C-alpha cells in the first residue's frame, strides 16, 4: 500500500513538472509571436507612404482612410 502511495506521489510530481515546462514554452511562444507582430506593425508604419495616392476603398491605404486619395 505504501509503495502505491509513493508511486502516486511521484506520478503527481512528474505531471506537475511537465505542466510547468509546457506552460513556460507556451508563454515563450506567445512572447515570440507578439514581438513578431509588433515588429511587422512597426515596419508597415515605417514603409507606409501612400499619402495622396488615388484610391477607391479604404483598405487600399495604409491608414485605411480614403476620400478619392489616401489621407
UniProtKB/Swiss-Prot annotation:
Would you indicate the residue range of the signal peptide? 1-19
This protein's major location comes to: secreted
Keyword Transmembrane helix belongs to the record: no
Which Pfam families does this UniProt record tie to the protein? Conotoxin (PF02950)
| GO MF annotation list | ion channel inhibitor activity; toxin activity
Q: Record's domain comment?
A: The presence of a 'disulfide through disulfide knot' structurally defines this protein as a knottin. The cysteine framework is VI/VII (C-C-CC-C-C).
Q: What is this protein called?
A: Conotoxin PnMEKL-032
**Species name for this entry?**
Conus pennaceus
Amino acid at each position: 500500500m505504501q509503495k502505491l502511495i509513493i508511486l502516486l506521489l511521484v506520478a503527481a510530481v512528474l505531471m506537475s513538472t511537465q505542466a510547468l515546462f509546457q506552460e513556460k514554452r507556451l508563454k515563450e511562444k506567445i512572447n515570440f509571436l507578439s514581438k513578431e507582430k509588433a515588429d511587422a506593425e512597426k515596419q508597415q508604419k515605417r514603409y507606409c507612404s501612400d499619402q495622396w495616392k488615388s484610391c477607391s476603398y479604404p483598405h487600399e491605404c495604409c491608414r485605411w482612410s480614403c476620400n478619392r486619395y489616401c489621407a
